[in-house]
UniProtKB/Swiss-Prot annotation:
Protein name: Chaperonin GroEL
Domain of life of the organism encoding this protein: Bacteria
Reactions that this protein is recorded to catalyse: ATP + H2O + a folded polypeptide = ADP + phosphate + an unfolded polypeptide
PANTHER family: 60 KDA HEAT SHOCK PROTEIN, MITOCHONDRIAL
Complex formation: Forms a cylinder of 14 subunits composed of two heptameric rings stacked back-to-back. Interacts with the co-chaperonin GroES.
EC number from the UniProt entry: 5.6.1.7
Length: 545
């Protein structure tokens, strides 16, 4: 085991604070509408330019082991805030730095670190309750666009495209962000349920100009097995021929004689039919077939529940307004399933998402829920260069997380105002002693830090701005974008409650632990092995006789 270096007391805290400051100072220049960019060197490819706090934090690794520990702990604050709410990473870092700086001053002055931490925790718990009281619902499109705009560093086009996407696919819908080909941002919306399986034979195509199959008001047959014998399908096909309606078959596979017969019947115009493979594999396929059944009002024909294909009737089939099948995808539009059953299925999937521990499973369940609830929107980010593309895509993703958080827990006035208002209401939290009271004061001072940093980044005097805002009331705050004061909600400067709450809780949690640190242990740097000295030159040989 390698030898370790141990640092105690104030020496340890000073080193830790130095690391905290290096990381936080690099991150906090990005805060607010007039925040600056940070350029990150990459070992390959072009440098990355970003205004995303967590991206900056993740890049920082310090040479001094003890300073690095401080930096890594603040990095943890940013990462946790990012995981919980998807935004607010810079705010969390600024709060953590403020609490640690003030806290360590108090410890150096002889106060009890544990009591300071308890005071900070009490203040934060009270602040979270006040934030919830201050919060307002974020229901309309305008508010969603404003939240998106603020999170995307005042880029209105991003806020608007996210609001449009949410309007089209609903609050539960899936919105994904991709790199686009154009210079401008684009929005693609797939309405209805789409899954990544195309037609089993090109002979089903009835729209040669688009190379797709379109079925109007079709029946939908769902089978959880391979179909290779046409005899199994005859009763359904005969019943269908009488109605004159088209049929979509979704099965594990349709092959051999069954597929050939379907193709021939389709080409002769006897029955208009198309077949696709069921989406997913194993248990996920069963679940997705059941989703389609609920969406279309049909029944999955599966032998494990005692249903046989030969005995199926038109009653077992689902129906939809329209189905479009391309080489790679099948889209079912306006299934005729019962709304109550669809809603029950959505809430069942929601429950599974909450219980799931795997990110992959969560993502797949989220997709299934979106397909049932309304559809999928894809935001294609446009930019002139790859460097700009990366920076813009990160901002769009941040804005998307922020709007989701706003829909979930509501919004509070932005620009650091919410924390200032909350601080004024919790000054008289009950505490057990003077040191705890000072812990509360540390937390209250820290709650001003984001507002002060926004003002500093805008080139204003932080103390003047902070006092002006503190003397106001309600939503009155400072708009750094155009250097004016006024009602933050009316000016459209909103922060999601969840983002502000998460930033405060994670910052206080980790900063509290740092204040109570008394010793730090790190490996000693390995001394380099000495070089082998150069071998002396061999003497010249004497003259030989």
């Amino acid at each position: 085991m390698a030898a370790k270096e141990v640092v105690f007391g104030n020496d340890a805290r000073v080193k830790m604070l130095a690391g905290v400051n290096i990381l936080a100072n690099a991150v906090k220049v990005t805060l607010g509408p007039k925040g600056r960019n940070v350029v990150l060197d990459k070992s390959f490819g072009s440098p990355l330019i970003t205004k995303d706090g967590v991206s900056v934090a993740k890049e920082i690794e310090l040479e001094d082991k003890f300073e690095n520990m401080g930096a890594q702990m603040v990095k943890e604050v940013a990462s946790k805030a990012n995981d919980a709410a998807g935004d607010g990473t810079t705010t969390a870092t600024v709060l953590a730095q403020a609490i640690v700086t003030e806290g360590l001053k108090a410890v150096a002055a002889g106060m009890n670190p544990m009591d300071l931490k308890r005071g900070i925790d009490k203040a934060v718990a009270a602040a979270v309750i006040e934030l919830k009281n201050l919060s307002q619902d974020c229901a309309d499109s305008k508010a969603i666009a404003q939240v998106g705009t603020i999170s995307a560093n005042s880029d209105e086009s991003i806020g608007e495209i996210i609001a449009t996407a949410m309007e089209k696919v609903g609050k539960e819908g899936v919105i994904t962000v991709e790199e686009g080909q154009a210079l401008e941002n684009e929005l693609d919306v797939v309405e209805g349920m789409q899954f990544d399986r195309g037609y089993l034979s090109p002979y089903f195509i009835n729209k040669p100009e688009t190379g797709s199959v379109e079925l109007d008001h079709p029946f939908v047959l769902l089978v959880d097995k391979k179909i290779s014998n046409i005899r199994e399908l005859l009763p359904i096909l005969e019943g269908l021929a009488k109605t004159g309606k088209p049929l979509l078959i979704v099965a594990e596979d349709v092959e051999g004689e069954a597929l050939a017969t379907l193709v021939v019947n389709n080409m002769r115009g006897i029955v208009k039919v198309a077949a696709v493979k069921a989406p997913g594999f194993g248990d996920r396929r069963k679940a997705m077939l059941q989703d389609v059944a609920i969406l279309t009002g049909g029944t999955v024909i599966a032998e494990e529940i005692g249903l046989e294909l030969e005995k199926a009737t038109l009653e077992d089939l689902g129906t939809a307004k329209r189905v479009v099948i391309t080489k790679d995808n099948t889209t079912i539009i306006d299934g005729n399933g019962e709304q109550a059953q669809i809603e029950a299925r959505v809430s069942q999937i929601k429950q599974q998402i909450e219980e799931s521990t795997s990110d992959y499973d969560k993502e797949k369940l989220q997709e299934r829920m979106a397909k049932l609830a309304g559809g999928v929107a894809v935001i294609k980010v446009g930019a002139a260069t790859e460097v700009e593309m990366k920076e813009k895509k990160a901002r769009v993703e941040d804005a998307l997380h922020a709007t989701r958080a706003a829909v979930e827990e509501g919004v509070v006035p932005g620009g650091g105002v919410a924390l200032v208002r909350v601080a004024s209401k919790i000054a008289d939290v009950e505490v057990a002693n003077e040191d705890q009271k000072h812990g509360v004061v540390i937390a209250l001072r820290a709650m001003e830090a984001p507002l002060r940093q926004i003002a500093t980044n805008a080139g204003e005097e932080a103390s003047v701005v902070a006092n002006t805002v503190k003397n106001g009331s309600g939503n009155y705050g400072y708009n750094a974008g155009n250097d004016t004061y006024g009602d933050m909600l009316e000016m459209g400067i909103l922060d999601p409650t969840k983002v502000t709450r998460s930033a405060l809780q994670f910052a206080a949690s980790i900063a509290g632990l740092m204040i109570t640190t008394e010793a730090m242990v790190a490996e000693l740097p390995k001394a380099d092995a000495p070089d082998m000295g150069g071998m002396g030159g061999m003497g010249g040989m004497g003259g030989m006789m």
